[in-house]
C-alpha cells in the first residue's frame, strides 16, 4: 500500500555485515540467507559502494588463477587482480560455464587461501535451482559465497547484488588475505535494471534508452578488481553477459 508507506532517510549509504561465516552460504540479492541457515553475525559493516582506491596504490597483476577451463587457462589466462569478461549469446551455455568456473577455480602456491564470490542477477527460478544444485555438490560451496537475485525480484535489488558481492570479496581479500574470484552473471540483466530505474526517475535516456551514465556505473564495479600494495589478497573478476540479439555493437557489450 503506497499510500501508507513511509520512508525515513538515515543519511548513510547501504552497508552489508561481513564475516568469515559467509563462506559456504547462499544469500538472496539483498544479502539475506536463503539456504535455511542462521543469520550472519557480522564482524563489521562495510559500505557496499566500496572506497576510493588510488591508482598509484595498485600492483600490476602477475600471478595465475587456474579456472580448470582449458581454453581460458591456455589462451586467455586469468591473472589475479584482472578482469576477464565472457561475452555470450542467447541460448549458449554460459550458466554452465559460470558454475563450472566457480566450482573448480583455484590458485597454486603453499599457504595461499582462495575463495569464490558468485553473484547471479535477474535469473529465472530454473536457473537459480540449477546454480543451487551445482553449489550443493561436495566441496563446491566450502570456500564460496553465493548471491542470487531472481528476475521477479525488485530492479533496485539487482543494482545492489553485485555491490554486495564485491564488498564481500574486498573484505575477504584485503582483510583476510584471500585470493578472491568474483563471477558476475548476467551483466545484461544488471544494465536492464539500470535502464528501468532511470526511466522511472524520468532521466534523459541515452542510446536505446540506457542511461548516459551506464558506462560510468559499470566502471564502479569493474574497477574494484585488482591488487593493492601492502595487501596479500587480490580481487579477480569474471563478468559474464549475454549480448542482446547477439549484437556486439549493442550499448551493453
Curated annotation (Swiss-Prot):
Gene3D superfamilies: 3.40.50.12240. SUPFAM superfamilies: P-loop containing nucleoside triphosphate hydrolases. GO terms for molecular function: ATP binding. Keywords: ATP synthesis, Cell membrane, Hydrogen ion transport, Ion transport, Membrane, Transport. It is a peripheral membrane protein. One of its GO terms (biological process) is proton transmembrane transport. Pfam families: ATP-synt_ab (PF00006). One of its GO terms (cellular component) is plasma membrane. Component of the A-type ATP synthase that produces ATP from ADP in the presence of a proton gradient across the membrane. The B chain is a regulatory subunit. Has multiple subunits with at least A(3), B(3), C, D, E, F, H, I and proteolipid K(x). Belongs to the ATPase alpha/beta chains family. PANTHER family: V-TYPE PROTON ATPASE SUBUNIT B. This is A-type ATP synthase subunit B. It comes from Methanothermococcus thermolithotrophicus (Methanococcus thermolithotrophicus).
